[in-house]
């Protein structure tokens, strides 16, 4: 599973020089022919190494990363990532310095690629013995061992993603995506297939590893199978989603559907350079592949996304947490799981679609009919999260064609908003993943008109914190989103609340674990609120009285969310963030030993109200939803006892979870209510009605 077909030993320099002398010119030429891909191996003198010497950077420690799945590792090839502001000349000089110092120690190295334009760094082939040396070089941020990535594939689908008003005898989308270009990083493609002929441009980019096995026979139909099928799903004449979109293909997977992290990185860099040289309209990049978690691949996706490119990727076919794989775990990427014709998670033998908090939504991914590379008119059925991602890439192309100025955050929010809700049987997922996995199946919006006038929000879960008392978890919104509220959740119920705090110029949601707890999640409510001015007001624990209170005191600001955290382990029957609209402006009220935080925002025409749903006796779950035209921005529990596991938003519904009431020993005095803050913009709603 390496990037070259065989492994080579690393010879000590004195022995290598002796062999070269013994072999003579003929032997040297033969060796040179055999090792043609080693033409840049460096034998440097000590004086050259000294000439490249630079003062080491103090106070910084570079780190080493490798794939957690051993069979996927590619030892001997490493991506050296340099600090963000490193110039190309410094990257090249750092690479030469590594070669010189390695040669002085008797090791041969080869610089395979120098990155620039997307991220600074270089790809090097070297012995693992040199890692300690490389980590100490100037400008080095971290080093990642290369690893493998894999294709993720094993006509109801078009009907499923089409809103009822558009359904007829055949699929006729409202916009074909003609203004959008889709880049596909996959295998090679049979570009003369009738489905995609004239719609796909095969670029000259190719970066793939050798196929495994000396007897592997490269049949064109197999080499082109995965890429041809996906190109047809995205923009095929008959079976495509975005029939008007144009495509460009880059080959990063070999005939066995295998590629490398480094090859994918170089492909993304190629796209960024093409974008700079030939600026066009909206770009969508489809990554129908998955490998182990990769910090460098996620970083490259982040850079490309912040340059205005929409990236869509497969969640993976391993029936596992998608956060353990890349690029599925990158927050800036739209990650897609797979469902079947009954809107249930796809099962692929003993495996199936990935799931979890890193998945944004699901899409059709079982028995998808598309172009076959067997002949220019053949069709074939394939399954997997690659096919699901291709559907979302097609939907994204049509949405961007209708609204070319959409940002990634706006596009993601629309994909979530217009998805089919609560149609997936969650029992298929592991119990600890059900609350984290979105119950959403992608669909086209019924109309783009008026969509921009809605208040869009989504729920973002953090990673699970550690079990120690001081452990915390942090949930973050995208750069273009506003954090309007913060909540927390613990399966054991042992937590110390949550708070909103500034970090790197942005508000984040931080949740606190408690002593004896098993860990906690932070849950952020992230919204698109143009021209918003938001802040957090905090009231420390009250010195006297029955509770702590805080409200929005700035003129024109409204309350969008409450949060609370405390240092004591057990507040007993306490009141964490609740709303008291009676007689006073909406305010957050909590236990006197807790700090209370109010999220207050001002935006054109923004108005918010409180909805509460209580029950006379405790239940395992209490919910309250916002009405049509209103959007849930805040979710909390009232009064909240030690039996409350937490509160979180699911679409437009506030959910409060309690411990199992049959074993928790609850009483009627500990009844729980779910409290929702529902907001809308009067200004935007009026503008929407005028358009309609």
From Swiss-Prot:
Residues the record marks as site: Cleavage: 152-153, 218-219
Species of provenance: Pan paniscus
Domain Peptidase S8, first and last residues per copy: 155-461
GO BP terms in the entry: apoptotic process; cholesterol metabolic process; low-density lipoprotein particle receptor catabolic process; proteolysis; regulation of neuron apoptotic process
Record: glycosylation sites: 533
Activity regulation (UniProt): Its proteolytic activity is autoinhibited by the non-covalent binding of the propeptide to the catalytic domain. Inhibited by EGTA.
Cleaved propeptide residues: 31-152
Subcellular location, record wording: Cytoplasm; Secreted; Endosome; Lysosome
Modified residues (Sulfotyrosine): 38
Residue intervals of the Inhibitor I9 domain: 77-149
Protein family membership: Belongs to the peptidase S8 family.
Stated name of the protein: Proprotein convertase subtilisin/kexin type 9
GO cellular component entries: cell surface; cytoplasm; early endosome; endoplasmic reticulum; extracellular space; Golgi apparatus; late endosome; lysosome
Cofactor(s) needed by this chain: Ca(2+)
């Amino acid at each position: 599973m390496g990037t070259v077909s065989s492994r080579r030993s690393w010879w000590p320099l004195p022995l290598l020089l002796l062999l070269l002398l013994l072999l003579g010119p003929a032997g040297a030429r033969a060796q040179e022919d055999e090792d043609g891909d080693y033409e840049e191996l460096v034998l440097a003198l000590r004086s050259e190494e000294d000439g490249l010497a630079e003062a080491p950077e103090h106070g910084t420690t570079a780190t080493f990363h490798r794939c957690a799945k051993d069979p996927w590792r590619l030892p001997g090839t490493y991506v050296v990532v340099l600090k963000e502001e490193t110039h190309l000349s410094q990257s090249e000089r750092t690479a030469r310095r590594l070669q010189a110092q390695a040669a002085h120690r008797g090791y041969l190295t080869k610089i395979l690629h120098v990155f620039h334009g997307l991220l600074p760094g270089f790809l090097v082939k070297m012995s693992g013995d040199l890692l300690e040396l490389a980590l100490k070089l100037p400008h080095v941020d971290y080093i990642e061992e290369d690893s493998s990535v894999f294709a993720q594939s094993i006509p109801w689908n078009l009907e499923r993603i089409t809103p009822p008003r558009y359904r007829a005898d055949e699929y006729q989308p409202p916009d074909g995506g003609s203004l959008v270009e889709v880049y596909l990083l996959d295998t090679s493609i049979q570009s003369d297939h009738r489905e995609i002929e004239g719609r796909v441009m095969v670029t000259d980019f190719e970066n793939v590893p050798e196929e495994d096995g000396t007897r592997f026979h490269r049949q064109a139909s197999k080499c082109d199978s995965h890429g041809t099928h996906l190109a047809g799903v995205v923009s095929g004449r008959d079976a495509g989603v975005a029939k008007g979109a144009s495509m460009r293909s880059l080959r990063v997977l070999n005939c066995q559907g295998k590629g490398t992290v480094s090859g994918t990185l170089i492909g993304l860099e190629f796209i960024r350079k093409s974008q700079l040289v030939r600026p066009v309209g909206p770009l969508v990049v489809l990554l129908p592949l998955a490998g182990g978690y990769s910090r460098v691949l996620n970083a490259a996706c982040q850079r490309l996304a912040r340059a205005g490119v929409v990236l869509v990727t497969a969640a993976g076919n391993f029936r596992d947490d998608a956060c353990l794989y890349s690029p599925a775990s990158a927050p800036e990427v739209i990650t897609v799981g797979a469902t079947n014709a009954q809107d249930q998670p796809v099962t692929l033998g003993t495996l199936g679609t990935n799931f979890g908090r890193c998945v944004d939504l699901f899409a059709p991914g079982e028995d998808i009919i598309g172009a076959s590379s067997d002949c220019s008119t053949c069709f074939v059925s394939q399954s997997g999260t690659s096919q699901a991602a291709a559907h979302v890439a097609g939907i994204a192309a049509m949405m961007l064609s209708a609204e070319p100025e959409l940002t990634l955050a706006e596009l993601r929010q629309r994909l979530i908003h217009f998805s089919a809700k609560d149609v997936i049987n969650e029992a298929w997922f592991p119990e600890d993943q059900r609350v984290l996995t979105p119950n959403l199946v992608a669909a086209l919006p019924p109309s783009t008109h008026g969509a921009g006038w809605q208040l869009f929000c989504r729920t973002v879960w953090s990673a699970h914190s550690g079990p120690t008392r001081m452990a915390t978890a942090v949930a973050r919104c995208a750069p273009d989103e506003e954090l309007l509220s913060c909540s927390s959740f613990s399966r054991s119920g042992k937590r110390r609340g949550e708070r909103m705090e500034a970090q790197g110029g942005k508000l984040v949601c931080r949740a606190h674990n408690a002593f004896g707890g098993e860990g906690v999640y932070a849950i952020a409510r992230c919204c698109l609120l143009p021209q918003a001015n938001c802040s957090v007001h905090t009231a420390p624990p009250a010195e006297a009285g029955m509770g702590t209170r805080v409200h929005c005191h700035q003129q024109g600001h409204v309350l969008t969310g409450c949060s609370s955290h405390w240092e004591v382990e057990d507040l007993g029957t306490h009141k964490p963030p609740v709303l008291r609209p009676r007689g006073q402006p909406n305010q957050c009220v909590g236990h006197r030993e807790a700090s209370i935080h109010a999220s207050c925002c001002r935006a054109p025409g923004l108005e918010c109200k409180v909805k509460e749903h209580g029950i006379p006796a405790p239940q395992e779950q209490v919910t309250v939803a916002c009405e049509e035209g209103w959007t849930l921005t805040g979710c909390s529990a009232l009064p909240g006892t030690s039996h409350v596991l937490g509160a979180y938003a699911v679409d437009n519904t506030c959910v409060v979870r309690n411990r199992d009431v049959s074993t928790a020993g609850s009483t009627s005095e500990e009844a729980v209510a779910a409290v929702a803050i529902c907001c809308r913009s009067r200004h935007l709603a009026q503008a929407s009605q005028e358009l309609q």
